[in-house]
Design a protein with these regions (language model features):
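Conserved ABC ATPase "signature" region
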Residues: 99, 110-128
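Helix-to-loop junction immediately C-terminal to a conserved catalytic motif
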Residues: 55
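Conserved ABC transporter NBD signature motif
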Residues: 63-75
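Short coil-to-helix segment of the ABC ATPase nucleotide-binding domain corresponding to the Q-loop/switch region
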Residues: 92-99
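Conserved signature/switch motifs of ABC ATPase nucleotide-binding domains
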Residues: 131-134, 148, 152, 159
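Signature (C-motif/LSGGQ) region and adjacent switch/coupling loops
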Residues: 20, 75, 95, 129-132
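The feature captures the beta-strand-to-loop junction immediately N-terminal to the Walker
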Residues: 40-42
Length: 178
């Protein structure tokens, strides 16, 4: 079986006036289809940097990152990435926020809208579809951002600090459902 994600000898340094700071050095691993991987470590150890490399927001100075055998590029639709901050648009309702990726991709089909409604129900946000982000708790906002990512049905799902504001029950259900 071919790996879904293949990272080989990836390195990256941040450049500043005071010199170079290594962020990641010679990272290699594979992720097979259906596998889960948790990257844990203290603040500043490079977890978010690695996720930014995997999704193509950053380019490695060395090494390669392949998704299903092809190089990852910025804006790769095969990757869903939920950032640390939810980045919900305050002027849009929760429902409109969740639809954003589908609108951009022009994928607003009846099937996708039914899936949106199912996810809103599954994650306890169906009664808040007309609310704006400022009206929701941190955990509810994070669930909305998760739904916005899941609705695009990516081949690879990257979650940066995904559970920091989620309650225990929601944390348990994320891996079970998706």
């Amino acid at each position: 079986m071919k790996p879904l994600l293949d990272i080989t000898d990836v390195s990256l340094s941040y450049h500043s006036l005071s010199g170079e700071t290594p962020a990641l050095s010679h990272i290699s691993f594979q992720l097979m289809p259906g596998e889960f991987l948790a990257i844990v470590g203290p603040s500043g150890c490079g977890k978010s940097t690695l996720l930014n490399l995997i999704c193509g927001l950053l380019r490695p100075e060395q090494g390669q990152i392949l998704l299903d055998g092809t190089p990852v590029t910025s804006g790769d639709c095969r990757i869903g990435y939920m950032l640390q901050k939810d980045h919900l648009l305050e002027w849009r309702t929760i429902y409109k926020n969740v639809l954003l990726g589908l609108e951009i991709r022009r994928e607003l089909t009846a099937e996708k809208l039914a899936y949106v409604n199912q996810l809103l129900s599954d994650y306890g946000l169906d009664k808040f579809r007309s609310a704006h982000p400022s009206e929701l708790s941190g955990g509810m906002r994070q669930r909305a951002a998760l739904i916005r990512t899941l609705i695009l049905e990516p081949d690879l799902l990257l979650l940066d600090e995904p559970f920091s504001a989620l309650d225990y029950q929601t944390r348990l259900s994320v891996g079970v459902r998706h």
